Amino acid sequence: MKLLSVNVGKPRPNPWKGLSATGIDKRPVDGPVAVAAPGPKGTGAVGLAGDRVYDVKHHGGTDQAVYSYAREDLDGWEAELGRPLVNGVFGENLTTAGLDVNGALIGERWRIGPDVVLEISCARIPCATFEGWLERDGWMRRFMQAARPGAYLRVIEPGDISADDPVEIVHRPDHDVTVALVFRAMTREPELLPRLLIADALPEEDKNLVRRRTTA
């Protein structure tokens, strides 16, 4: 299990969401990249040095510090879409190999390289920017049907990471709430929502959303 690439975004115009810019255009970088907890959502800060987000209402902050997607899932989408998908094209900071990102448990911890420890926090929910960026009508619906969302992570221990660093799972919590389960519950299968609250590491924002939806 390893990192294939560490990807950092460059600002691009965002005509799809009425914002001045988007950071979804992430490209692999050479050499070490510093990773640190960015603080609360709302500033545009994220976990990787040199990266940022512009939709500060929905992205960034402690619980969405880093976004990871598996190369194996990108390869699957390449076959389905009939086009090459380079590392970073889904807006992911970390492109991994040998990890079941969607099967990771909320609260699972990964050590990357010698120093950095990240914790799985939640699933990526697609937006209009993602659909516009890929230039595929109906992409959000297709992405949701596949339930291969990739994972957001929070920073537990800071440090530097680089492409080809090993990734080790150092903790798996005692529950069955995976990234894919969270995604399915939040999008197409609301009957699964009550199962999510057993995951202590789920962001408070998501827990509150679950409570509202299940008590309405």
Task: Map each language-model feature to its residues.
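Short alpha-helix capping/helix-loop boundary micro-motifs
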Residues: 96-98, 150-156
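Loop/turn positions that initiate beta-strands
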Residues: 107, 158, 162-164
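Conserved binding-pocket/active-site segment within a compact domain
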Residues: 125-131, 135-138, 144-145, 158
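Short amphipathic alpha-helix initiation/capping segments at coil-to-helix junctions
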Residues: 154-160, 175
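Electropositive, beta-rich accessory/interaction domains or terminal extensions
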Residues: 1-131, 171, 175-216
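Short, basic/aromatic beta-hairpin or loop at an interaction surface
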Residues: 83-91, 136-149
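A short pocket-lining beta-strand/turn micro-motif at the edge of beta-sheets
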Residues: 31, 149-151, 163-165
